[in-house]
Amino acid sequence: EVPKTLDEFYDLLVRFRDDDPNGNGEQDEIPLSGSDGMTYLRQYLVPSFGIKKFDMEEKDGEVRYAPASEDAREYYKFMNKLYEEKLLDQEVFSQSGDQKKAKGESDRLGVYHDWFSYFTSGKEEEEAVTDPMFHPLTSEWQAEPLAPIKTGINRSTAAITTANEHPEATMRWLDGLYDPEIANLMSVGPEGHVWELDDNGKRQYTEAAQGDVEEVRSKVAPNYGLEFPGYHQDKEDYDGPDLTIGDEENPFITFVKQETADKIDPYGEVPLPDLYLSQEEIDKTQAIIGDLETFIEQEEAKFITGQKDINDDAVWEQYLQEIESMGLDTLVEAYQAAYNRWVEAGEQIN
């Protein structure tokens, strides 16, 4: 069964390493793999340690910087254990996405990240329904499953320059991106490419999209692989799951919807609302954020690979002192103030 606790997850990784699941007679399996360091894997693993996001997050009404918490230390310890026991890909901090994919296509990976599993495994879409989605893990640090989710509103970035002769029209256009129908257009493109209407007025996949929907969508959907401003809240509108092949819904879409309903939706929590900092707060924190991101990325790799001993209290204290010296208090103070304003605004609306 899919593991639901941190201990069960560890046991599964050991089985991937030792039991030759690909059946080739060689111990060539990599239990847990990723690319670009822990950037993508991390978001699935830190919730097991009571962390919603490895950055600024809200916990019990207070804003904190998660990498400076004791929860982060437990995460580092666990990942170091996986690395030392070769349960974590030894190339996780150096390999590209294509290198990870090559391992997946060779049937060597047990657990990995990707938008869809077949992007890494190389399987056909219909075959990928046998690859289950990761289930949020409980542990001694997290009693209930926890799945970080977005607010449903994607602010992204947009700019209107002084050369724009029609800023009002541009604002109307940007505002329109938050309309569910427009959001759907941005996600799956205009009629006739990914989808078309059947005789009953219901959307169905075009013949071209039935072969490889993502290949077709990548050519016509404006927000494919991009962070666009827009409305994400209603998955029925945004993701277009009513698309069918004839009278049948795409089996893979059905699979993804069910996996999400079972494993993500019941446990979803937003790490931190979309906050707006004042210009003064931005000026104070901008450099701090950049410095901390670089520092944490480097220290995370050192702790996990054992270059620094995460079990050494003196090493840990030095790590915390470095974070504090970069302006942690200023950063938390600014985000706490912005969070308090967000709470107050909500109370006024209600």
Named regions from a protein language model:
Residues 176, 181-302, 307, 344:
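Conserved small-residue motifs centered on glycine
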Residues 3-10, 32-49, 111-121:
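Ligand-binding clamshell of periplasmic/extracellular solute-binding protein-like
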Residues 1-39, 55-103, 158-169, 173-200, ...:
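Helix-loop-helix "hinge/cap" segment bordering the ligand-binding cleft or interdomain interface
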Residues 81-84, 100-117, 122-123, 137-142, ...:
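Glycine-rich, aromatic-lined ligand/substrate-binding cores of catalytic
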Residues 299-350:
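Histidine-centered catalytic/metal-binding microenvironments
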Residues 27-33, 108-112, 128-133, 157:
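Beta-sheet entry/capping signal
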Residues 56-61, 75, 126-153:
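Active-site-adjacent "gating/activation" loops or surface patches in catalytic cores
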